[in-house]
C-alpha cells in the first residue's frame, strides 16, 4: 500500500495494526494480535504495535487523475443507405490533496463512473425499496464518518440518491469534499452539482457531518443535508429546498462486567416542510427518534430498542 494513499502523522514511528488469516475448511482463525471473541479484530485497542516506521513521507500528497472518452453512433434511418451519425467527445478530472496529515480534500469534474462495479440483480417482493450498496469511489471514501446511528435503520443521508432519479442516471457536473480528522473531531463535508436533463432540473446536494469522539469507544455527532433544485424547464414543477438535521449519540464499552460489551445509542432526525401539505404538519410528523440498548456477547446476547 503506497504511503501517499494514507493519512498519517509522519512524526509517529509506531502504528497499531493487526492481521487475520481465515481457513474456512477448518473453521480456523489465526491472528497476529489476539482478541477476545466478544470484541473482534476491528477494535483499535486490540491491535498490535508496529514499530520502526521512520523517515516515511506522504510526498506532495497530491493526486491528479484525468480521463477522456470518445463515443460514436451510426443508426439507419430507414431511407435506404442514409444513416444518422452522432459523435461525442467527453472528459473529466479528479484531484485529491492531503491538506494535513489527517485531512483530505477532493475535487471531481464531469465525473465518470464507467469503472464502477455494477449492482447485483435482486428480486424485491416487498413494498419497501432495496438499498443497493454504494460502489462509486467518490462517495465511498469517508462513508464510515457519514454513517448515522448505525443500528437505527434510519438513513438521513444515502449517497445512492445522488446522480440517480427514478432509476435514471443523472450526470454529475462537479463535486467537492473534505474528509478527515481534526483532533478528536471527525469531519466530513460534501457538495455535488448534477446536470439538467430532460426530466429533472439541475440540483445541488450538500451534506456536513461532525462527530466528536470521547472516552475510549463513544461518540456524539451531528448531520446536516440539503437538496436544492434549480429553476429550469417550465413544465417541471419547482421544488422547495429539502433540509434535514440529525443528532446521534453512541455510548460503548467493552469492559462491562470486566470483559463484556454494552452499547447504548440514541438519535433524533427532523426535516423541513417540502410540500404544501406539510406546511401545517407538526414537528412530530416530520421527525424520527429512537434509542437502543444492546448486549452483543457470546453465548448470551440481547437488545432493547424504541423508535418512532
Where are the language model's segments positioned?
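Outer-membrane beta-barrel channel domains
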Residues: 1-74, 78-308
Amino acid at each position: 500500500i503506497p504511503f501517499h494513499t494514507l493519512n498519517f502523522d509522519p512524526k509517529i514511528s509506531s502504528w497499531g495494526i493487526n492481521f487475520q488469516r481465515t481457513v474456512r475448511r477448518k473453521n480456523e482463525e489465526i491472528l497476529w494480535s489476539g482478541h477476545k471473541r466478544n470484541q473482534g479484530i476491528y477494535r483499535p485497542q486490540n491491535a498490535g504495535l508496529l514499530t520502526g516506521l521512520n523517515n516515511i513521507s506522504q510526498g506532495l500528497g497530491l493526486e491528479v487523475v484525468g480521463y477522456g472518452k470518445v463515443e460514436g453512433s451510426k443508426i439507419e434511418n430507414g431511407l435506404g443507405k442514409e444513416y444518422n451519425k452522432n459523435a461525442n467527445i467527453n472528459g473529466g478530472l479528479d484531484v485529491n490533496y492531503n491538506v494535513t496529515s489527517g485531512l483530505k480534500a477532493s475535487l471531481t469534474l464531469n465525473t465518470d463512473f464507467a469503472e464502477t462495479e455494477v449492482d447485483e440483480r435482486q428480486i424485491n417482493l416487498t413494498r419497501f425499496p432495496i438499498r443497493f450498496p454504494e460502489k462509486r469511489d467518490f462517495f465511498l471514501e469517508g462513508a464510515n464518518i457519514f454513517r448515522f446511528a448505525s443500528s437505527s435503520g434510519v438513513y438521513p443521508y444515502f449517497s445512492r440518491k445522488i446522480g440517480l432519479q427514478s432509476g435514471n442516471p443523472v450526470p454529475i457536473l462537479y463535486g467537492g469534499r473534505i474528509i478527515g480528522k481534526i483532533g478528536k473531531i471527525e469531519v466530513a463535508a460534501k457538495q455535488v452539482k448534477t446536470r439538467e436533463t430532460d426530466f429533472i432540473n439541475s440540483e445541488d446536494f450538500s451534506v456536513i457531518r461532525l462527530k466528536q469522539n470521547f472516552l475510549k469507544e463513544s461518540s456524539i455527532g451531528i448531520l446536516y443535508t440539503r437538496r436544492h433544485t434549480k429553476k429550469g424547464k417550465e413544465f417541471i414543477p419547482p421544488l422547495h429546498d429539502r433540509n434535514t438535521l440529525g443528532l446521534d449519540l453512541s455510548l460503548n464499552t467493552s469492559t462491562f462486567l470486566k470483559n463484556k460489551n454494552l452499547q447504548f445509542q440514541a438519535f433524533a432526525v427532523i426535516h423541513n416542510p417540502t410540500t404544501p401539505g406539510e406546511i401545517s404538519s407538526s414537528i412530530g410528523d416530520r421527525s424520527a427518534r429512537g434509542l437502543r440498548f444492546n448486549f452483543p456477547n457470546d453465548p448470551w446476547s440481547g437488545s432493547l430498542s424504541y423508535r418512532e
